[in-house]
UniProtKB/Swiss-Prot annotation:
Annotated TM spans: 19-39
GO MF term list: proton-transporting ATP synthase activity, rotational mechanism; proton-transporting ATPase activity, rotational mechanism
HAMAP family per UniProt: ATP_synth_b_bprime (MF_01398)
SUBUNIT field: F-type ATPases have 2 components, F(1) - the catalytic core - and F(0) - the membrane proton channel. F(1) has five subunits: alpha(3), beta(3), gamma(1), delta(1), epsilon(1). F(0) has three main subunits: a(1), b(2) and c(10-14). The alpha and beta chains form an alternating ring which encloses part of the gamma chain. F(1) is attached to F(0) by a central stalk formed by the gamma and epsilon chains, while a peripheral stalk is formed by the delta and b chains.
Regions annotated as coiled coil: none
Cellular component aspect of the GO annotation: plasma membrane; proton-transporting ATP synthase complex
NCBIfam families in alphabetical order: ATP_synt_b (TIGR01144), PRK05759.1-3 (NF004412)
Membrane-related topology note: Single-pass membrane protein
Domain of life assignment: Bacteria
Principal subcellular localization: membrane
Role, per record: F(1)F(0) ATP synthase produces ATP from ADP in the presence of a proton or sodium gradient. F-type ATPases consist of two structural domains, F(1) containing the extramembraneous catalytic core and F(0) containing the membrane proton channel, linked together by a central stalk and a peripheral stalk. During catalysis, ATP synthesis in the catalytic domain of F(1) is coupled via a rotary mechanism of the central stalk subunits to proton translocation.
Keywords per UniProt: ATP synthesis, Cell membrane, CF(0), Hydrogen ion transport, Ion transport, Membrane, Transmembrane, Transmembrane helix, Transport
Descriptive protein name: ATP synthase subunit b
């Protein structure tokens, strides 16, 4: 028997599940081509522009980073050179300070030695002057005492200046001679 289903099947082939109809393929191809043209014409240039912008930004960033790195390296080298120069200068200053300190110490020592020699010479001169003054004073006093004693022993006045001066000089010479003999005797 012939049923409508069988009639249709006899006149046409049944549609395939895997293969669509020809009109679907044509319309799908037309839509695909239209979409491809629209994307190619409008979207793709924007994507390329965006990618080019990103590429330029990345390249610019890399270039800036390389410049910054080069500047940092140059600054580091300059600072290292300045540091080495500063250390060398500090060493020179330290050495100059040592030399100056040695020279100043020598100068102060020389000045102190000269001052000590001057003070010693001045003190010796003062001592010698005071000794001479004491000798003169003692000679005068001893002379007076000797004349008074001699006047008392002799019983006559020794007012004659020449005689009294000669007597005093002889007495003092005897006194110095006995003192010198006492020193040489005690030294041996």
């Amino acid at each position: 028997m012939l049923t409508p289903h069988n009639v249709m099947a006899a006149g046409e082939e049944a549609p395939s599940i895997l293969l669509p109809a020809v009109y679907d393929i044509v319309w799908s191809a037309v839509v695909f081509v239209v979409l491809l043209v629209v994307i190619w014409k409008y979207a793709l240039p924007r994507v390329y522009a965006m990618l080019d912008g990103r590429t330029e930004a990345i390249a610019g960033g890399i270039e800036k980073a390389e410049r910054a790195q080069a500047e940092a390296d140059a600054a580091k080298a300059e600072l290292t050179a300045q540091l080495a120069e500063a250390r060398a200068e500090a060493g020179r200053i330290r050495e100059q300070a040592r030399v100056d300190a040695t020279a100043i110490a020598a100068e102060i020592k020389e000045q102190a030695t000269a001052d000590a020699a001057r003070i010693t010479a001045s003190a010796q001169q003062q001592i010698e002057a005071e000794r001479q003054q004491a000798v003169v004073s003692l000679r005068s006093e001893v002379g007076s005492l000797a004349i008074d004693l001699a006047s008392g022993v002799i019983g006559q006045s020794l007012t004659d200046d020449q005689r009294s001066t000669a007597l005093v000089d002889r007495f003092l010479a005897d006194l110095e001679a006995s003192e010198t003999a006492g020193r040489t005797g005690s030294a041996s």
